[in-house]
């Protein structure tokens, strides 16, 4: 267990999510692989998933602009075919909060909170909890 893992586990527990992932900008052919995750019971891991090219995802374009993405209904969020394929690949991703983790001027990591199975209304408090967790994670990167 690293210093990162308790932050993800707490976010999973406090917000009662299905999955929390941290994707880091690491050298290599795959952009932003999942390096850490916390999972609810019965939820599949994304640690070895390498079929979704994040460079083509509309959410990442928002993150690069420094914006957090809050989606209560992912299916309705973007018509983009690559985005829709990602939802299925990620186990029926239905709602998410995706928060950039910047170190200096660069996007160093992506913190994602996932809800599987059904849309979910997120609160400002939920989004703020993700922003606070991202700030804590930035200290370890």
Language-model features: locations:
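Regulatory sensory and allosteric helical modules in signal-transduction proteins
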Residues: 42-88, 94
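Short coil/loop residues immediately preceding or within conserved phosphate-binding loops
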Residues: 17, 58, 96, 108
């Amino acid at each position: 267990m690293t210093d990162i893992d308790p932050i993800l586990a707490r976010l999973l527990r406090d917000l009662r999510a299905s999955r929390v992932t941290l994707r880091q900008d690491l050298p290599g052919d795959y952009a932003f692989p999942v390096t850490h995750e916390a999972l609810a019971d019965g939820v599949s891991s994304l640690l070895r998933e390498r079929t979704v090219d994040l460079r083509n995802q509309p959410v990442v374009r928002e993150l690069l602009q420094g914006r957090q993405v809050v989606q209560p209904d992912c299916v309705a969020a973007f018509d983009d075919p690559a985005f829709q394929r990602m939802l299925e690949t990620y186990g029926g991703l239905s709602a998410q909060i995706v928060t950039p983790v910047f170190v200096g001027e660069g996007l160093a990591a992506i913190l994602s909170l996932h809800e599987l199975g059904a849309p979910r209304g997120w609160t400002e408090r939920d989004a703020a909890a993700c922003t606070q967790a991202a700030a804590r994670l930035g200290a370890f990167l």
